[in-house]
Amino acid sequence: MATERLTRVHSLRERLDETLTANRNEILALLSRIEAKGKGILQHHQVIAEFEEIPEENRQKLTDGAFGEVLRSTQEAIVLPPWVALAVRPRPGVWEYLRVNVHALVVENLQPAEFLKFKEELVDGSANGNFVLELDFEPFTASFPRPTLNKSIGNGVQFLNRHLSAKLFHDKESLHPLLEFLRLHSYKGKTLMLNDRIQNPDSLQHVLRKAEEYLSTVDPETPYSEFEHRFQEIGLERGWGDSAERVLESIQLLLDLLEAPDPCTLETFLDRIPMVFNVVILSPHGYFAQDDVLGYPDTGGQVVYILDQVRALESEMLNRIKKQGLDIVPRILIITRLLPDAVGTTCGQRLEKVYGTEHCHILRVPFRDQKGIVRKWISRFEVWPYLETYTEDVAHELAKELQGKPDLIVGNYSDGNIVASLLAHKLGVTQCTIAHALEKTKYPESDIYWKKFEEKYHFSCQFTADLFAMNHTDFIITSTFQEIAGSKDTVGQYESHTAFTLPGLYRVVHGIDVFDPKFNIVSPGADQTIYFPYTETSRRLTSFYPEIEELLYSTVENEEHICVLKDRSKPIIFTMARLDRVKNITGLVEWYGKNAKLRELVNLVVVAGDRRKESKDLEEKAEMKKMYELIETYKLNGQFRWISSQMNRVRNGELYRVICDTKGAFVQPAVYEAFGLTVVEAMATGLPTFATLNGGPAEIIVHGKSGFHIDPYHGDRAADLLVEFFEKVKADPSHWDKISLGGLQRIEEKYTWQIYSQRLLTLTGVYGFWKHVSNLDRLESRRYLEMFYALKYRKLAESVPLAVEE
């Protein structure tokens, strides 16, 4: 039998060299086109557009070879004639950098730092020989296990359990960390799980077997209190369960683990340990309240997300505490900013109970400067100089409220995450990070040209805060895979922080690794009491019908709604979002305005922005101006309705269902959307949904089955897809029902708050455990981060102007 020869895998550069030899003229033609663009950056879609402009015969020759592969994987091309440097991404999380001399057709490999240095030459005056601070977090993770398969991205806890369960339980000596972990559990001075009668692994196993023997002789329903004293005498305390049956299961899980460890048993056992009683959730910016705030500046999906999150989390915590046989009252505190100028909201109230909960409160702490308390709202882009003092004030308030430390701190968005990092660092508590949106992805080239954005957005400070928090945290929750590592063709939000440069400030050669086991995908859901299917007629909120009728169809034009719908028989295309550039609402209006066929088939209704008051948000002002211009340019009155932001969530749920009654559709046209809560909400009511393929909605929707993907950069195609859908529905009404049902099924399978809250508590337990028993605490990197914070972040934060109080 012939033996197969193992051949060396050629590098990308070597394969490119071979292609250059074979197709010199064709490659030269393309590279010359790119070089002719002059000094600058070409994004992936621009590189592909240039490729499509060369003659078809040449295209065909290049498509199948190494050069075609490089082109398809190129995320950006840096043009500095005669050189073109390429950032090539063969698959998510894997990057290579090349540089081609267009005149000599010479290819060079570049290290990340070399590529970034080359890129910096685009910015005048940055290509000097001075020492540049380079950030590299890779050495701190070099000794730590790292998965390499794409399917492991976002499944960090499973990988961690597999790797470390094998490592931890290999001999008697290695069981000591587990024993110590079980002994450290207590609540307000009351010992849980094990007391000091158990001193070593041998005595633990002996006691567990003794307990197992006893429990197998009693009625499974026997409450723990009946054998509590007996167990205390042998070394076992409360926390194992509320009944003999539950305690026996927990003890058997631990015995199985000690005998033959496996990751599933480990996770199940850790799930049962009483670890989380007090949770702190940080969300400083915006108007955080429960009523009449949605649509205020910086106040949208994140507020809804957190309020839904805490309700589900409290329910799950109460359920677990009961099953653990404890009578502890949990606390969940949402920490946000107290606004003395609360403009008709409850944002000036220190403590506010969360509706539908027993033990969740919003705790508001004001921003302070040297003059005292800051009274007015401040944009999320300008909060940075206040956050260090704010952290100290929050720590003081928490000590008063909780009479102890929290067990978990969850940060939200950039400001919440850096405050969470500082608090977790100070208190030694497990930290979870939720980005919601990383602004670097939303504003292309905002890193290399950061100075252009600085006056308005202060991105240098925000990107530094993001980098600090994502490296400091114990675990990161994302709603989608795309948020971490994008897709085959698009770069993930976190992935975009792998290597980047802020010329004149610092160069990040290794900022984050998307394969890091700290990443976990935990998708949120829609509130099922509000967003339920339009077919559930007995639950429909008919009392809202007159108000919804007024919103949609009234002939009156005022600050609440302008433009009228003349033909009520037509289906409605509906969208609802903040009015900013990234949400791209004006983009959708323009697509509609330009497409005569779409206008003939359907009406368009937009809920965005607040025309009832003067906006303080510069971006919102610009988008409003654009909206008025579009109405005039395309003569939209008669087919279009613009409604000011609607803050009543319960009524909004019924509004979605009324759109379903018209056999309409929901469109989410964002340039980029981290998750897409409105997409989940619309689908949960049965409304067929068309949403951006950039970000989370690409995963929420299965194209053609539970909705449709649209490309915000090709509005004409998106409009044509809508035309195609509504023409199909006109010919066959069951097509609408099919997509509606597909959306409902997708939500039920994957996007519920119950699944979310169970997962969050499981992750807290697992990461808390590994942090204790291994080197997962990442002490070395924390020291590095302290220096980065003190020497870079603090100075950047101080450079942001303080708000002027009138």
UniProtKB/Swiss-Prot annotation:
Its EC number is 2.4.1.13. Pfam families: Glycos_transf_1, GT-B_Sucrose_synth, SUS_EPBD, SUS_N. The keyword Transferase applies. Keywords: Glycosyltransferase, Transferase. The keyword rRNA-binding does not apply. One of its GO terms (biological process) is sucrose metabolic process. It catalyses: an NDP-alpha-D-glucose + D-fructose = a ribonucleoside 5'-diphosphate + sucrose + H(+). InterPro entries: Glyco_trans_1, Sucrose_synth_GT-B1, Sucrose_synthase_pln/cyn, SUS_EPBD, SUS_N. Residues 275-752 are annotated as: GT-B glycosyltransferase. GO terms for molecular function: sucrose synthase activity. It is an enzyme of class 2 (transferase). Transmembrane segments: none annotated. SUPFAM superfamilies: UDP-Glycosyltransferase/glycogen phosphorylase. PANTHER family: PTHR45839, SUCROSE SYNTHASE (PTHR45839:SF31). Belongs to the glycosyltransferase 1 family. Plant sucrose synthase subfamily. Sucrose-cleaving enzyme that provides UDP-glucose and fructose for various metabolic pathways. This is Sucrose synthase. It comes from Vicia faba (Broad bean).
